[in-house]
C-alpha cells in the first residue's frame, strides 16, 4: 500500500512553482549541492510514502545481498546518448555488460551495457541514493527531468523501458552466466513478471 500512495501531486506542484521558473532552491547531500526540481520532489515523496525504508545508499545493500539476507536487485536505466543500458547494483556485475563475439566473426566482446559502480567509482558511485537509482530507471519524459551524470561527455539517463521494459535481458544473461551452478544446485528457475498493463493477445492468423 505504501508504494501505491500518491506521488504525482508533489511532482506537479514542483513543475508549476519551481521547474517552469528559475530553480533557486538547493539542497546538500553528501558534501555536494544540487538544485531542487521535480526529481527531488519525487524522491522526497517516495521516502515519505515508504516511511524511510528506501532512504539508503547503494553500498548499504552490498552485505545484505552478498549474505543472501535480501534479494539481489539490478536497476538498469537507459543512456540516451548511445542507447546503452546503465546497470546499477551494489554487487560487481560486469558479466551483464558484454555481448559474446560471434563464432563466424573475429571480433572482441562488445560492451552492450555500462556498469555504474565501476564506471563512476571515482565519483562516489557507492554513495548513490537508492531512490535516485529508482528514479533514473523510471524517468518518463516530461514527468521527470532527464538525469545528467558526471562523465565526459555527459551521460543523459532516462527510463529503463527504452531498452528493456520488463528486465528480460538481465534475467536471461544472469541465467546464462550461472547456468551450470543453477543446474547443479537448484530444481529450476521461475520467472515472475509484474506488468503495468494487460498483456496483448496474439492476433489470430
Q: Where do the protein language model's features map onto the residues?
A:
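Catalytic domains of lipid- and phosphate-ester/thioester hydrolases
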Residues: 1-205
